[in-house]
UniProtKB/Swiss-Prot annotation:
Pfam families: Trp_syntA. It comes from Xanthomonas oryzae pv. oryzae (strain PXO99A). This is Tryptophan synthase alpha chain. GO terms for molecular function: tryptophan synthase activity. Pathway: Amino-acid biosynthesis; L-tryptophan biosynthesis; L-tryptophan from chorismate: step 5/5. GO terms for cellular component: cytosol. The lineage of its organism: Bacteria, Pseudomonadati, Pseudomonadota, Gammaproteobacteria, Lysobacterales. The active site is at 49 (proton acceptor), 60 (proton acceptor).
Length: 268
């Protein structure tokens, strides 16, 4: 959790926006995950969101659903994800890593047992898509005790009452879903409406606010970053990596995809 706080403080001091790429652990191959993570850092990633493959990813569009299915088919379970983070930490002790996933695998593992294992591996935070904020107190308490940030999600349909709760309990950063839908549906991105909401959230939240869903290239990243503390890019990157033939190709594709977004954010 401290790595996340330090990174955003550093970015704020330098007047820069956070670039947060999302990849699915185990896709395009088990061997490629860690090399791709390092490649993303070289290309300008400030935080990495690592997707935990799940059999029923309800918030994800077809691109990430297929990616998750491929990863599960290769055996990329929770143990693999934590081992990948542990391996990444052998060379990178600074870049925050946030896991994005669903409750079921965590509950099967045992929340406290998982949280302790995640921190030991080098994980900084967790974003649980299907954990309602009204039911998050126990999980948040366990995570806070061991040093994990519980990243919250807000969307255009989030009620004011729930927003108040999210803003007052936000840890690490608040992830604003720029439209009500599934990941990858970039045609639904409404920059103007999202920007207005982002400005409001940044005034209310006790943590940085980042925007995701629908960001697919340098132009959309720069546009959304104007009123956010950072942007998350997922489906478009996952789609680019899916075409990789080997680890080297995956690394090259990761850097080639992300570098223009970094440049656009720094020039915005």
């Amino acid at each position: 959790m401290r790595r996340i706080d330090f990174r955003f403080a550093e970015l704020r001091a330098n007047g820069r926006k956070a670039l947060i790429p999302f990849i699915t652990a185990g896709d395009p191959s088990l061997e490629a995950t860690v090399p791709v993570m390092h490649a993303l850092v070289r290309a300008g990633a400030d935080v990495i969101e690592l997707g935990v493959p799940f059999s029923d990813p309800m918030a994800d569009g077809p691109t990430i659903q297929r990616s998750s299915e491929r990863a599960l088919g290769r055996g990329a379970g929770l143990a693999y994800v934590l081992e990948a983070v542990h391996e990444f930490r052998r060379e990178d002790a600074a870049t925050p890593v946030v896991l994005m996933g669903y409750l079921n695998p965590i509950e099967i593992h045992g929340t406290r047992r998982f949280a302790e294992a995640a921190v030991a591996a080098g994980v900084d935070g967790l974003l649980l898509v299907d954990l309602p904020p009204e039911e998050a107190d126990e999980t948040r308490a366990i995570f806070t005790e061991v040093g994990l940030a519980l990243i919250a999600l807000a969307s255009p349909t989030t009620s004011e009452q729930r927003l108040d709760m999210l803003c007052s309990t936000a840890q690490g950063y608040l992830y604003y879903v720029s439209f009500a839908g599934v990941t990858g549906a970039s045609n639904l991105l409404d920059t103007y409406a999202a920007s207005d909401r982002l400005r409001q959230l940044r005034q209310r939240a006790g943590a940085p606010v980042v925007a995701g869903f629908g960001i697919k290239d340098a132009a959309s990243a720069a546009a959304m970053a104007v009123d956010a503390d950072g942007v998350v890019v997922g489906s478009a990157l996952v789609a680019a990596l899916a075409e990789a033939d080997d680890v080297r190709s995956a690394r090259e594709r990761a850097e080639a995809f992300l570098a223009p977004l970094r440049q656009a954010l720094d020039q915005a």
